[in-house]
């Protein structure tokens, strides 16, 4: 069975995959797999930009999304979807007419002019023509997108956003907790301060020392409520709450005592 593996840590947001998909499918139909994709309003391959943290401790994470390749969509679509021998699926442009209900699935878009739902086909027409990978994968300069037989792909630690999907992800962003320890009296940052990230149950999740800029960052921690406990030699330990349940947390510049 064919599948995609997307390594979020490798994606730099160049949008090549998104542009290549539009280039391949806009202005051309590839029947029986797909009718022409509209110039606007549809992104069968779409790169989501996530701005995380707060100034000056911010990060931008890019997450490519590819639609249409899931068992859930197949179950809902019935005979309007076709599964190829290689496992790729596509919505039949003729049999799917009028099925606007299928647009509730991620990456499925409604074509008002043609009255059909449309989504990724895995560039089945190119695979039939001898290509080894779809356009989006071929255009990725960092190899963030990979495509092939499941048995040949490295799925160790990979996860699906949708159960039964042919799209697997590696290094999906979790949360980060960051800050800077400052000696305001001396007008200097605190280098080498001990910092711990402590869970609600009191367990130390991670620990590190502040760097040459007085900064610390606990990256890829699970979404949860934490406490940051830090101590500068010769000073009393201090504690700050850091609720990373919903968002990444920057506790800002904090005093040594």
Go through each PLM region and give its residues.
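Hydrophobic loop/turn residues within beta-sheet-rich immunoglobulin-like superfamily modules
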Residues: 11, 70, 94, 221, ...
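Flanking helices and flexible, charged tails adjoining ferredoxin-like Fe-S electron-transfer domains
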Residues: 29-75, 79-80, 90-180
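Exposed aromatic-hydrophobic patches
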Residues: 91-93, 215-220
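Short, ordered, surface-exposed loop/turn motifs in non-cytosolic proteins
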Residues: 175-177, 184-201
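Short, acidic Ser/Thr/Gly-rich low-complexity loop/linker segments typical of extracellular
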Residues: 200-215
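A short, solvent-exposed beta-strand micro-motif common in secreted/extracellular proteins
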Residues: 222-234
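Structured interaction patches on ligand/partner-binding surfaces of diverse proteins
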Residues: 233-257
């Amino acid at each position: 069975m064919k599948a995609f593996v997307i390594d979020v840590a490798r994606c730099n947001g160049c949008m090549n995959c998104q542009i290549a998909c539009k280039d391949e499918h806009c202005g051309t139909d590839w029947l029986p797999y797909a009718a022409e994709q509209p110039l606007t309003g549809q992104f069968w391959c779409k790169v989501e930009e996530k701005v995380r943290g707060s100034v000056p401790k911010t990060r931008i994470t890019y997450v490519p999304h590819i639609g249409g390749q899931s068992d859930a969509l197949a179950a809902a679509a019935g005979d309007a979807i076709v599964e190829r021998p290689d496992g790729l699926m596509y919505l039949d442009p003729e049999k799917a007419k009028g099925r606007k209900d299928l647009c509730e699935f991620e990456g499925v878009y409604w074509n008002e002019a043609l009255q059909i739902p449309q989504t990724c086909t895995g560039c089945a027409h190119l695979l039939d023509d001898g290509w080894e990978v779809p356009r989006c994968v071929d255009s990725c300069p960092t190899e963030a997108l990979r495509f092939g037989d499941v048995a040949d792909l490295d799925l160790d630690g990979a996860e699906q956003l949708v159960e039964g999907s042919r799209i697997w992800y590696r290094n999906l962003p979790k949360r980060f907790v960051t800050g800077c320890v400052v000696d305001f009296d001396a007008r200097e940052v605190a280098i080498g301060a001990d910092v711990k990230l402590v869970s609600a149950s009191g367990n130390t999740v991670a620990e590190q020392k502040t760097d040459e800029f007085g900064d610390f960052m606990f990256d890829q921690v699970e979404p949860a409520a934490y406490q940051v406990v830090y101590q500068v030699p010769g000073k009393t330990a201090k504690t700050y709450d850091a609720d990373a349940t919903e968002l990444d947390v920057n506790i800002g510049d904090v005093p040594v005592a």
